[in-house]
Amino acid sequence: MSLLLKMLLFSLFFFYMASISQCSDPTGGQFSFNGYLYTDGVADLNPDGLFKLITSKTQGGAGQVLYQFPLQFKNSPNGTVSSFSTTFVFAIVAVRKTIAGCGLSFNISPTKGLNSVPNIDHSNHSVSVGFHTAKSDKPDGEDVNLVGINIDSSKMDRNCSAGYYKDDGRLVNLDIASGKPIQVWIEYNNSTKQLDVTMHSIKISKPKIPLLSMRKDLSPYLHEYMYIGFTSVGSPTSSHYILGWSFNNKGAVSDINLSRLPKVPDEDQERSLSSKILAISLSISGVTLVIVLILGVMLFLKRKKFLEVIEDWEVQFGPHKFTYKDLFIATKGFKNSEVLGKGGFGKVFKGILPLSSIPIAVKKISHDSRQGMREFLAEIATIGRLRHPDLVRLLGYCRRKGELYLVYDFMPKGSLDKFLYNQPNQILDWSQRFNIIKDVASGLCYLHQQWVQVIIHRDIKPANILLDENMNAKLGDFGLAKLCDHGIDSQTSNVAGTFGYISPELSRTGKSSTSSDVFAFGVFMLEITCGRRPIGPRGSPSEMVLTDWVLDCWDSGDILQVVDEKLGHRYLAEQVTLVLKLGLLCSHPVAATRPSMSSVIQFLDGVATLPHNLLDLVNSRIINEGFDTLGVTTESMEASSNVSLVMTESFLSSGR
């Protein structure tokens, strides 16, 4: 059980066995740090008005400051809790943070007293808001700073990191044990039944956005009269102070005059003790010096392992660059147990970022030469700015020696090919497959036509299509992607992609284009519908190539023969037929015959219909003037479907 939870439980139940004292409140439920205060445990009041709740030198202790009289929170025992609010300024000075940590809590409790209760009743009628800090138990981890709400239970109902929200919604973290004064506002609204907690440095005004909110009626949990105050649990090296406090049980609280707050005392004695320990350590000679030298050499070798060479031109890509050390820790040293998958270009590892605990996927690839590295990283940085619901977000990269690491959002369901081929007990139904096709089409259309530049993916296949927890598809792995401006052809490069998805013109010229992506997408549509790979051994030679097999079955009048046997007859024949025919059109060997992705989406959505003589077009071996040769024009298509088919390029003079 964490210290914050222990502290909250302790503060909620330290009054457990006593009875409520129904004495009158001389302030009428409103006060600003007046003299009606009661202290208990390790707590005292300094002459300047500063309350110190923890002042232990040898072992951890507990202190309490509370308002001496019970305050009325209800008009009757069975009534509803009225609106109330409080604000206070506290400071925690920790000379040395420990894993055990320390903390402070504001409490509303039925009794006063600092008692230890071994058996906790879950109906103690108490409310507590706690602030806890502790040193991380990881070498490179961030210190813990938490705020939590506990209402009448042994578990925290709500908690979050300590800090405050700016007006633009950005969270600014606060170190609770920095020794600097921090102001807290706790407000309960009777109308909305909402409890808000806000905290901030006293150097700024109260933020408009609460840090922590919880909507819950407190009436069942509070008596008519309750005590309010603070409890503190600390380590031997921490001191907790309450500098100012204001409360109102009838609505909005009066602000504290910050100019009159007492100063937090310097912990010179504790710092002096630390300095003496350091001086003694430095005076040790001989064996200690040898040990230090050995440790220094070991540390140097460890740092050398994570050493990265950053060239001047990489500075512009800084926001997209991860350190190798972070990725090494995230993937547990790139262990095989963390491998999500692997292909011809490298392995993909699952990782957890050490600071944020965000799950990521890291693809490790080898870049064959330094030539073109700068241009490659420029494209990676550009793609990293893409934001689309059907694209896996590229978070950044890391470069170390001859290796590149691409960092993506983690997709919990993994890649599509696992569901198609490696998970016989989890079969994708037709509705899921059709939605996946539409998701990928939407993402690819965004890359080709809707962004400021044209992005050619160059490696569309099921292994690069990832699924989230709701089985929504996202196109990922931009390791081979190329960019070019709209209206300008991409440059010739090495042939990249996966066998079976590479278009004929790409293998001849080495020049990728949007139409080569459309070709791969067409093969993908056939693959997900038929449940088999583009090229593979089948019963007869005519079935070896997927596109040829589907076309032959269409020619013979039984195109539904190719549907994945695992689907049985649980599919919409009209949708399946559309996908198969559209897949053949997209994978046509003539680049100019293939539709653009915007047209593909129109066909899939039913906005446009395929031409009635599409089989002749797909079977055509000689195309002189595109659809006009077959008596099909964009005008005639527009007349029948109200949408014209947009082709990817001008027609070539050869066909399938």
From Swiss-Prot:
Regions crossing the membrane: 277-297
One Pfam family named in its UniProt record: Lectin_legB
Annotated organism of origin: Arabidopsis thaliana (Mouse-ear cress)
Keyword ATP-binding: yes
Cellular compartments per GO CC: plasma membrane
Recorded topology in the membrane: Single-pass type I membrane protein
Domain of life of the organism encoding this protein: Eukaryota
Carbohydrate-modified residues: N78, N124, N159, N190, N257
Similarity annotation: In the C-terminal section; belongs to the protein kinase superfamily. Ser/Thr protein kinase family. In the N-terminal section; belongs to the leguminous lectin family.
Domain Protein kinase: 334-615
Protein name listed in UniProt: Putative L-type lectin-domain containing receptor kinase V.2
UniProt keywords, alphabetically: ATP-binding, Cell membrane, Glycoprotein, Kinase, Lectin, Membrane, Nucleotide-binding, Receptor, Serine/threonine-protein kinase, Signal, Transferase, Transmembrane, Transmembrane helix
